[in-house]
Amino acid sequence: MQNGQVIDEFASDVNPHQELDDHIIHLTGITDQQLAQAPDFSEIARTIFELIEDCIFVAHNVKFDANLLAEALFMEGFELRTPRVDTVELAQVFYPTLEQYKLSHLSKVLNLDLAQAHTAIEDARATGQLLFHLMDKIASLPRQTIEMLLTFSDNLLFETELVIRD
């Protein structure tokens, strides 16, 4: 995503070489048969790395996703050093009175598209929409409010403050 537009997408299943537990199958709709035909991570690692190496890595609960991806890429010889932004944390800052911050809940409350939660591509698209929604909200705030928020930005995870600063 760049300047509020999707400029590229990549989606692929990955063969985990083990059976999924029932919870994951129910949550995602992915089956063992589907993954058995998917490529190994080593086959797509370079493509993923090249797509994101010069980007800001944005995720809903970035700590989980970025660490998992960085570890998998490292095992394939790639070191992921992208700045990281967490939309959970941004939503907590700019919508402090919400009852929960699950992507599905935020999508419903903020009227974002999330056709099938817990599928990587749909979650990524909804996270992008959430980021743009939050950026619009930030842009609508008085400069004095943004400056005050930035005084507390050292408490944010990773480089999440970049969204507020820009």
Region roles according to the model:
Residues 41, 89, 123-124:
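Short secondary-structure capping/turn micro-motifs that flank functional sites
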Residues 1-83, 96-100, 104-118, 165:
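Conserved non-catalytic scaffold segment of RNase H-like nuclease domains
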Residues 44, 92, 126-127:
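Short Asp/Glu-rich motifs
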Residues 82-92:
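A short, structured active-site edge motif that brings together acidic residues
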